[in-house]
């Protein structure tokens, strides 16, 4: 019987050259975050199902990979509902596990904890190009700080990580869920209508203002409310945060977002932009305040985002703890870098080739000599078709090669 050797749908294998880039990007991000004082932690990929389904993860709650209970008899299974069958699930993000981790270890952590976490998350998406069922996230979070200093630190630290990768064609979009709610309720919509109206407002870039108006009317919202909201959107687009007080947004909220924007502008030294965007929504239901995204020039999607989630930890311990996080979209970032023909800099990785007649001990001694000089060296027997062999190693990400000679082994770079 023929065996299917492809990865499961939505999963991927990585060849050496791509894995080299992925590891390099991850190392740069992690080292930048650690350099700015964030502490690396690790949480399990499996969580108790009640923690996952009770977390306000928005649409992601429908995409949880659930793990069936073990050891029950068939008759017991037949009498259970879907939720009864599963007691565990694979994490769909790193924020929910972090919240549980913090509650479990609160006594051992500082009052303001700066967490760094990197790991794979899992979502039962419909498999299609660009959508994976397993993908890596790189998160930094600040727990225990209710001030806007936390947002400023997250935004500037994430920007430093991107700069360390020579990514410079990006800007930060920022909004606040309280601004969204204030304006939408002021225009006459109800609390119950808020989430669905937000989903439509979020489509401005794709369908334009007239498209938003048509979709709101098609959903049978009151025409007066729709008219007020469109007028509000047009005015906010022109004046930014200056007109928000006219729509019932509290002065404290406006001052907070203005302070973040002005502080980041000063700290960015003009290397990237930050702008207020009322139509920025973000999908997670657990956000309570500021929300932000990284916009990459020329792409139709973000390469990272986050926000404040001051109510999530309270669901675990009955006490609200302020928290805010930022996640780099690792997969999108790596894919874009590869698209731009990114090469790992200063990669001293070579292949040392030898003939059958060479003494293998001498070849290994030469390899160790090169390694002592800082090279990463792989040793292979020279193929009859040398050109094809060298082309393969260049494709694997090697910077050069050397053919062993007892007197003079010369390293030759592929791109010279």
Each language-model region and where it sits:
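TRNA-binding/sensing appendages of the translation machinery
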Residues: 1-92, 96, 152, 156, ...
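N-terminal targeting/leader regions
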Residues: 2-15, 194-243
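Positively charged, Gly/Ser-enriched RNA/tRNA-binding surfaces
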Residues: 21-36, 47-48, 82-85, 93-107, ...
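Short acidic, glycine/serine/threonine-rich loops at helix termini
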Residues: 53-57, 127-133, 183-187, 287-288
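Acidic, His- and aromatic-enriched active-site or binding-groove loops in soluble protein domains
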Residues: 60-74, 188-211
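Short, basic, helix/turn surface patches
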Residues: 65-77, 199, 401-416
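Short, conserved phosphate-binding/catalytic loop or strand-edge motifs used
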Residues: 132-138, 174-182
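Short, surface-exposed recognition loops or helix-turn segments adjacent to catalytic cores
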Residues: 169-178, 197, 275-281
């Amino acid at each position: 019987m023929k065996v299917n050797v492809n990865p499961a749908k939505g999963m991927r294998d990585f060849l050496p050259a791509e894995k080299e880039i992925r590891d390099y990007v991850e190392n740069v991000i992690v080292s930048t975050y650690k350099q700015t004082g964030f502490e690396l932690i690790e949480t399990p990929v499996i969580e108790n199902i009640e923690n996952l389904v009770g977390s306000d993860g928005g649409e992601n709650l429908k995409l949880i990979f659930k793990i069936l209970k073990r050891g029950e008899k068939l008759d017991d299974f037949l009498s259970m509902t879907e939720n009864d069958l599963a007691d565990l699930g694979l994490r769909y993000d790193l924020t929910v596990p972090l919240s549980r981790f913090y509650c479990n270890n609160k006594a051992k952590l500082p009052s303001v904890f700066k967490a760094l976490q990197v790991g794979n998350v899992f979502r039962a998406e419909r498999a299609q190009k660009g959508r994976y069922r397993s993908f890596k996230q790189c998160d930094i979070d600040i727990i225990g700080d209710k001030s806007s200093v936390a947002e400023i630190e997250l935004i500037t630290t994430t920007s430093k990580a991107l700069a360390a990768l020579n990514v410079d064609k990006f800007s930060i979009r920022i909004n606040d869920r309280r601004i969204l709610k204030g304006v939408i309720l002021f225009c006459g919509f109800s609390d119950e209508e808020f989430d669905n109206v937000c989903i439509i407002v979020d489509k401005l870039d794709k369908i334009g203002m007239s498209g938003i108006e048509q979709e709101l009317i098609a959903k049978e919202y009151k025409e007066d409310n729709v008219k007020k909201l469109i007028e509000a959107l047009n005015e906010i687009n022109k004046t930014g945060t200056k007109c928000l007080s006219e729509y019932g947004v509290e002065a404290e909220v406006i001052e907070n977002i203005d302070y973040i924007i002005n502080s980041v502008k000063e700290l960015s030294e003009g290397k990237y932009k930050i702008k207020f965007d009322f139509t920025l929504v973000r999908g997670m239901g657990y956000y309570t305040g500021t929300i932000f995204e990284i916009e990459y020039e020329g792409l139709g999607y973000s390469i990272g985002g986050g926000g404040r989630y001051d109510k999530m930890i309270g669901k675990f311990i009955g006490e609200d703890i302020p928290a805010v996080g930022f996640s780099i979209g690792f997969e999108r970032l790596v894919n874009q870098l590869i698209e731009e023909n990114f090469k790992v800099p200063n990669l001293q990785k070579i292949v040392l080739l030898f003939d059958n007649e060479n003494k293998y001990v001498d070849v290994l001694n030469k390899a160790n000599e090169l390694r002592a000089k800082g090279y990463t060296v792989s040793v292979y027997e020279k193929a009859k078709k040398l050109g094809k062999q060298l082309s393969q190693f260049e494709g694997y990400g090697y910077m050069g090669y050397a053919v062993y000679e007892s007197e003079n082994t010369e390293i030759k770079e592929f791109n010279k």
